[in-house]
Amino acid sequence: MASKQAKRKEVHRINSAHGSDKSKDLYHFGSNVPPGSFEQKKGKFPIWPEWSEADINAEKWDAGKGGKEKDKTAKSPIFHFFEDPEGKIELPQSLKVFSWKRPQDFIFSRTPVVVKNEITFDLFSPNEHLLCSELMRWIISEIYAVWKIFNGGILSNYHKGNLGELPILPWKPWEHIYSLCKAVKGHVPLFNSYGKYVVKLYWMGCWRKITVDDFLPFDEENNLLLPATSYEFELWPMLLSKAIIKLANVDVHVAHRRELGELTVIHALTGWLPEVIPLHPAYVDRVWELLKEILPEFKLTEEPSSESKITTIDNKLKEATKENKDGKDGKNGKDLKDGKDMKDGKDGKDGKDGKDGKDGKDEKADARDLGKKNKKDGEKEKEKFKFSLHGSRPSSDVQYSMQSLSECSSAIQLPHMVVYATFTPLYLFENKIFSLEKMANSAEKLREYGLSHICSHPVLVTRSRSCPLVSPPKPPPLPAWKLIRHKKETVITDEAQDAVPKKPEQFLEISSPFLNYRMTPFTIPTETHFVQSVIKKGTPLGSSLPPLVENDLVASTSQGEMSIVNGNQSQGNIALQITLGKDEPSEPALADFHQLEATSLDRDLISLTTATLDKSQEELAINEGVAKEIWLDFEDFCVCFHHIYIFHKPHSYCLNFQKSEFKFVEERVPYYLFVDSLKPIELLVCFSALVRWGESGALTKDSPPVEPGLLTAEAITWKSLKPLSVVLRIHTYATKASVVRLPAGRHMLLFNAYSPVGHAIHVCSMTTFVIGDEDIVLPNFEPESYRFTEQSIIIMKAIGNVIANFKDKGKLPAALRDLQAAHYPIPLNNKELTAQHFRVFHISLWRLMKKSQVAKPPSNFKFAFRAMVFDTDLLDSFSEDVSLAEWVDLKYSTPINEKEYTSEEIAAAVKIQSMWKGCYVRLLMKARKPETKENVTVADTLQKIWAVLEMNLEQYALSLLRLMFKSKCKSMESYPCYQDEETKLAFADHTVNYADQPPNSWFIVFREIFLVPQDMIILPKVYTTLPICILHVINNDTLEQVPKVFQKVVPFLYTKNKKGYTFVAEAYTGDTFVSGARWKLRLIGSYNPLPFLARDSPCNTFSIKEIRDYYIPNDRKILFRYSIKVTVAQSITIQVRTSKPDTFIKLQVLESEEVITSTVGKGQAVIPAFYFLGNEKALSSQSSKQVLLSHPSPKKDPEVLTKKKSGQPGQKSFKGRSGGGLTDTGMPLLEEEILNIPTLEENSSTPQQCYKYIIQCLVLFNSWPLNETQLTFVQALKDMEKMDIKEKHEEPAPMGSPDSHAVSEGQKSVGVPKTTRKGKEKSAEKEKLAKEKQAPRFEPQQVQMPTAVHSQQEDPNKPYWILRLVSEHTDSDYVDVKKDTERADEIRAMKQAWETTEPGRAIKAAQARLKYLTQFIKKPVTTDTTTSAPSPETLSVSQSQTKSSEEGELDTGKYADIKELPPNAAGSVLWKKWQMTKTITSLTKFTSSESVPKEEPPQKEIPVVRQRSPTILETSPQQIRKALEFLDFSHYVRKTAAEAVLQTEELNKQQAMQKAEEIHQFRQHRSRILSIRDIDQEERFKQKDEVLEMYGEMRDSVDEARQKILDIREVYRNKLLEAERLRMEALAAQEAAVKIEIEKKSPASDSQKKKKVGKKK
């Protein structure tokens, strides 16, 4: 059963994993084996399998039972213990292994156990000899951190309550170990005497099963080199550490600098994802805000109790006493329990007792933090690991509770996070001076807080604080009488009073077991600050005068050993005094009072806490472990640490995606991601990379470079090949995570993962996302985005609100305003654009309403709509047939008047129209006014329309907004959802199947015409397993190809055309056999409808016609010319390939010798599709094809039509002809042509257009030179072809053109002449020879191929080429391809006609040529009587015939395929010709070297050989050589000197040096001229800039002067206005005074009058 489970589990492994035969390790059995004995490490081993509880339950833990252990321990079956098949672990270099022992070899007191104490453990005190190793410090620190995170609060409550029952701990480190137990919750591993243990750790994206043995390393002093607890017989730390070290050995790090790379033990123990954030001085403020969000925050209560103060001081005093007492830091941190009371009194944080109680020590650090304001340096080398389990928990909950960790309440709770921080060791051999500076600053600051830079280790960041630890005492209330007209104190001084900025309270609490380890913290005074002191100068005691407040310059004197009480008190006083001195007016006497009061209070507290110093350390450190806490100023925190890590719990996120791949290939794996949200998006992306396997993790100088794994994320859009932005880039050797933050909306991301061995990707988010292959993700981009849907529904609901309140007088104006705000959210500040926007909205709404009315709309439908939108001209100026986008672009155009009207008529028409329009507008206004009859009618009509729309509100809303977006109005860009249009897409797939293909074959996979219904951007993508597949897209109207980048078609704007676009896919199999499979073309566009096929289904059966021949160089550089005629119009693909892969060729299609289309290629050239118009016969049965031929005859029309039909695949199955199938000369063809002449004449009488197409290929840039072997082969090939042609055309009868289309094109037609008797007698022999030599060896071959199977083996040493014509299988019978020999046949027939009409013409021409040559030929002088020079007659005749032959051949040199040979081709003729070839070639080289300074290329030699006449070949080569020796070339030689000089090597060198000197002088002169030009240009630019600057300064000066004048004017004006105002006020006051005086006088006078009257009475 175990073996079956092992085989089943092996699915997750990689059998081809890398491994290395590591060096032998020390293997010591107690004292029985000498230290020098070694054991070879095991070889390759598979990657650790994924965790499976079924495998653990079926595991065999003893020896020899089951095949699993036998396979793994195949080394020595005689041992009765388990030995790790992966070999011994590799310890860091700081730990020297001397021997390996099993637990039975060094534990004698009792039987070893895996777990002894399940409540507490001590990994610090027993392992001080291991703390020199960075790896061991990390393991110990991170085990403590995870223990504190999960179990800190539970154990604190347990020890405080002294409960009898043991608490249930959420996490136990020994539960990662399995031995002799089942995989159940809460299992306890047992000691296994066999030595086999299984450890469960998280690695490469999942939990892994890691098997270890119980061999433990020891050094020479017999010290265990793995962490252990205080119980020496407890094994779980050693076993767990061995598995962790296995993971560390896979990681990559630099030897002699670090002992571990990017591995994090917390990630291995918990599976949480580490996010790396470097601390850079530029954005430390953002880091503080992030930490404040994540970490629990320490807060002060309004009234802290005195009991909490006493308890806090108690703990701090004890801590300080213990630190001075002994250096055993392992026990110093265990006295943190009683400090919980202070926390309870301050925060009311229930679950954080254990953590808050540690504030006693942290307050001590706080006193030191107060006076430190160090500058922040750039930090990059230290790593910070942040564990903030608290992302969404309330700030009152300070303790990490497992309950909050384990719960993931969907979208209500935010993810849990934990903050961690580390610093790297001090490396003195660092080459970068900036790194050394950072290390020095960090080491100095760490020492102030009791940490050592040498002992690098991770620290846990637990809390943040933005307030003092102890709340300052409140000032006594001021008496009410002092609050009346309270004046600020006046300070008499002549110095400027500068406000001292107050440093913000920013502190972080860290927890570390290495705090104050073997060192005493101290503070280095680096800055000064002002401390206010109250000094009464010149005043006697008891004086009531206010004292003077001065600032004395005092250095920071707070010491690390200072009591935390004094530190807190001084901190509180300073903060209070600064506040009072700067902001609040207060009397100095109050400050004195507060200071004295605080001092007396502190003395009382100290006296109260001294009694607690006698308590034992055990009572104060109940199960708090060795971890201690301290508060750090955030500014100092940024100096000490360079990176922070935030560990995210993945299960606290709503959505998780995980994918792992192990492939030993260096290729990037793409992942597409879709996300859409109405709120900002956060994606947590974790990437794990395995860059190598089975090798040591340390990198030395001799190690090969190892590239890290790479994960990139790009925001892409299918409309562009360039990504919009790179949003993420992760380089790692182990595991790293990062948060991708995206704005609200829809996004398309492309992840590319690269790792040599394997990788794992993990994506978490609280927002819904889809990630995977393109087929999985693309369908999510078809629906409208969330923002688009929301915007459309808002608009539609606003329309419904208007319709519902159309009869309500009070609500209708508000509803109309809401509708305008919905569809016109942002003012455009452009009247024309705003008017266009409203018109677009009204037309879109009209189209939607009209479309929604399935039944007959109401009679007043249009009137009701106009009343609602209040637009009378809209529907009249808009045509229903015109698209909205076209209507937007159109401007109002004046109508064309067919006749001219008089001014009176125009005025009358305008008056009538204005009257009717005014009446209609008044009617609309009345309909919009509630409580009118018209309004009720319109409202009822609108209600009926809305009832239809409301049934499918969302669909109609999307249609409305989509209509508006299709208008392409610029105002649509103001909508927020417009940004989502970049990712809006629709796609359609078209698939075909292809058959099996042999190696090195080319074939067509797909060829179809697509019709584009509307202008849109389209991206075609090909999905296939073919090694090479290229897609071509051709516009059938213009015959232009859509541009490609790296052989891929780019997104392109496809405009609507008449003949559509042809999509052609060509493929090449390469060196391997390709089996048949499915090929898919995907068209991606913005919206439907997408381009569609011109027929129902695509064609996948094609016929390939192959033509092979050899390259024969010629003067015109023509590779070949073939004429092609099609009976039925069809599309054909043309491909040419050459044997020389770097030859530049140009493939052309000619119609009537005019280039219709062409393409240039290197080694091959392809015309993807060309539509050939057919010459259909009168009795053609292809009636369906005749429709396609009914096109006009002008030349341009066939050209355009060619492109349209090229999309329809046309295949051809040719009738293969053996031998001379491509040679269209000979008697059989002539006879057939003679029989067909009457038919052609009948056809020519019809008005049908006859199309003549030529396929021509040219060699460019002389890019196909031939070597000697190839030249010899080509020469022999030409000679044999000449013999064949001579045999076929030996008779003097004239020959007409073998091609029937030559007659139909109107060229000169040659009749059949009367043949001579000799020709008639030799006709029978000719037919016989034609049958015998039907297929010469070097004859080009024409092969009909259903597929691209080669008919003969290709010889790469011969210059051959292949022409392929691909048509649809059904149309292949209607294609005829022939070699184009029309011009050669015409020349040959012309010569024959001349000879027939004028006999002896050839002889006369030969005599004339002889006469010309005799002028330059001298008779050779020779004494040899046996050998005589040729007679003049013989030589003249031969040379005249040679000249005649050359004249004819020069005319035909354009067509190198037509050649002539002598009539008597005997067996020895070929040998003679080969000899003559060598002779004339050497002669040509010699002659050209003397006459022409530049030697002609080898291609020029070949026509000379071909132009020799048969008469010369019959002459002896010696005679020709002697005759040519006496040729007079003197008049061809150009003399440049008076006397001839011998051309020697010295002369050549001298001339070369002169030439080089001239070139050098010219180059110097040229460079001088160019430099002068550059200088002049720079001066001109400089002068131009100076002129612009001068005018700019003049403008600025004028503006400044104008502004000064205006300012002076304004001041003067204000002064006058002020004076006028004062004068008016004075006058008003004067008048008021006068009036008062008058009023005072008038009552007095009245009273006096009354008194007088009374007296009179």
Curated annotation (Swiss-Prot):
One of its GO terms (biological process) is proteolysis. Residues 70-402 form the Calpain catalytic domain. GO terms for molecular function: calcium-dependent cysteine-type endopeptidase activity; heme binding; metal ion binding; oxygen binding. Keywords: Cell projection, Cilium, Coiled coil, Differentiation, Flagellum, Heme, Iron, Metal-binding, Spermatogenesis. Residues 1585-1640 form a coiled coil. Disruption phenotype: Adgb knockout males display infertility, reduced testis weight, impaired maturation of elongating spermatids, abnormal sperm shape and ultrastructural defects in microtubule and mitochondrial organization. Females display no fertility issues. Epididymal sperm display multiple flagellar malformations including coiled, bifid or shortened flagella, and erratic acrosomal development. The spermatids are not able to move to the lumen and enter the epididymis to undergo further maturation. A high rate of apoptotic events might further aggravate the decrease of sperm. Its main location: other. It comes from the Eukaryota. Heme b binds at residues 791, 823. Residues 905-934 form the IQ domain. Residues 1-40, 321-398, 1184-1226, 1288-1356, 1422-1459, 1638-1657 are annotated as: Disordered. Residues 1-11 have a biased composition (Basic residues). Residues 762-889, 935-967 form the Globin domain. SUPFAM superfamilies: Cysteine proteinases (SSF54001). Residues 1341-1351, 1422-1443 have a biased composition (Polar residues). It is found in: Cell projection, Cilium, Flagellum. Interacts with septin SEPT10; contributes to in vitro proteolytic cleavage of SEPT10 in a calmodulin-dependent manner. Interacts with CFAP69. Interacts with SPEF2. May interact with calmodulin. The globin domain is circularly permuted. The globin domain, which normally consists of eight consecutive alpha-helices from A (N-terminal) to H (C-terminal), is circularly permutated and split into two parts. The part containing helices A and B is shifted C-terminally and is separated from the main globin sequence (helices C-H) by a potential calmodulin-binding IQ domain. Probable chimeric globin with a bis-histidyl six-coordinate heme-iron atom through which it could bind dioxygen, carbon monoxide and nitric oxide. Required for sperm flagellum formation and maturation of elongating spermatids, thus playing an essential role in male fertility. PANTHER family: ANDROGLOBIN. This is Androglobin. It comes from Mus musculus (Mouse).
